[in-house]
Amino acid sequence: MSATAGDIPYLGHDVWVGPQSQWWVHQQVNLTRKAATAVWPPDPYLSLATTRAVTRSGDHLILEGVPSPVTGVQLRKRVALSSTRADTVEVEATARNIRSESIAWDLWFNTRVAAGTRVFVPVADAADIRLQPPTEAGTVAPIYRHQGGVFALRADVRQDGLIQRGKVLLQPSAGWMAGFAGDQVLVIRFAHQPLSAIHPEQGQVELYLDAPPRHPERGLLEMEVHAPYRQLAPGERMQANEQWTLLRYTGPDAQQAQHQFLCSKAQELQLTNACAPSSAAP
């Protein structure tokens, strides 16, 4: 393991804490990272250490991580089949302050998918979108569309040889986002939070893109959700959760058609603001 290894684009799901700027500030394990106010890598005790299966049954799994001397928390994760929908799982994370003094973090869910995924997020105004462009040579910022109260992002093929890289921080108008990949749609639902509850350096929803120009499907797109930023007393816990629903999609690979599909599911899945103002879910 190396702090200079870069962001290896493994797909899947991880849980971090935020804000990112504080990852290595409140620890004595690696003084070099602390002095650099490093923003990479994430806490390895949360992401890479072996977890213990506390409970394993036919409908749910509970995993317990190790106490982290880097961020001062211990994570417990629960993944359970929904009791009401066969196509849905519930994902929950709990962080406990293991230190003898107060700490302050948020819980940060990161679902990593292929960059060819088209992601939709309900966003009311352009002012609710903050773009963090790349600084490296040979890169270009993600290109997104925002129309009818819905934000859409996907890495498309580029002929100019530029890597599509950067992050978009969003204040959503409702607690969901959806990613289309082939004949599947992953809908992630979560508790919608006011802007004041989220650390100012983050967005409640963040999308990070890193995609090669000719084969963007080989790149990485992170579908991230931040829970409220909280101060925890010694031994205190905080919790966040998401619901993941996997749907079959047989329509064309086109933004308008996919948006309309989400609108058709708005009432069933409580996808507030999924429909354009002139549309209505059946």
Please tell me what each predicted stretch does.
Residues 1-90, 98-282:
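Surface-exposed acidic/polar loop and edge beta-strand patches at domain peripheries
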Residues 93:
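Beta-strand-loop-alpha "switch" segments that mediate conformational coupling across diverse proteins
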